[in-house]
Amino acid sequence: MATKKKTFEEAIAELETIVEALENGSASLEDSLDMYQKGIELTKLCQDKLQSAEKRMAKVVTDAGEEIPFEADGE
């Protein structure tokens, strides 16, 4: 079975579904643990995609050809 890489938006949507299901509290302990584990994996995927986007943004070049460093707030 081929696995398609999720987009950031798909991962966020699935993560939101998992959070809603966990907040509902009707799943069994085993199902809750499985959903929690999947949620952690999706969170890591989203973080990786955001870091990748941040690196791409950092390489934006000005008209003079100078790199504009990207600095996150609070860093």
Swiss-Prot record:
Signal peptide per UniProt: none
GO BP field: DNA catabolic process
Presence of keyword ATP-binding: no
InterPro entries xrefs: Exonuc_VII_S, Exonuc_VII_ssu_sf
Gene Ontology MF annotations: exodeoxyribonuclease VII activity
Compartments (UniProt record): Cytoplasm
Keywords for this protein: Cytoplasm, Exonuclease, Hydrolase, Nuclease
Pfam families assigned: Exonuc_VII_S
Main location: cytoplasm
Gene Ontology CC terms, in alphabetical order: cytosol; exodeoxyribonuclease VII complex
Domain of life: Bacteria
Family matches, as SUPFAM superfamilies: XseB-like
Protein EC: 3.1.11.6
Catalytic activity: Exonucleolytic cleavage in either 5'- to 3'- or 3'- to 5'-direction to yield nucleoside 5'-phosphates
Function: Bidirectionally degrades single-stranded DNA into large acid-insoluble oligonucleotides, which are then degraded further into small acid-soluble oligonucleotides.
Subunit details: Heterooligomer composed of large and small subunits.
Family per record: Belongs to the XseB family.
HAMAP family to which the protein is assigned, alphabetical: Exonuc_7_S (MF_00337)
Protein name: Exodeoxyribonuclease 7 small subunit
Organism: Listeria monocytogenes serovar 1/2a (strain ATCC BAA-679 / EGD-e)
Encoding gene (name): xseB
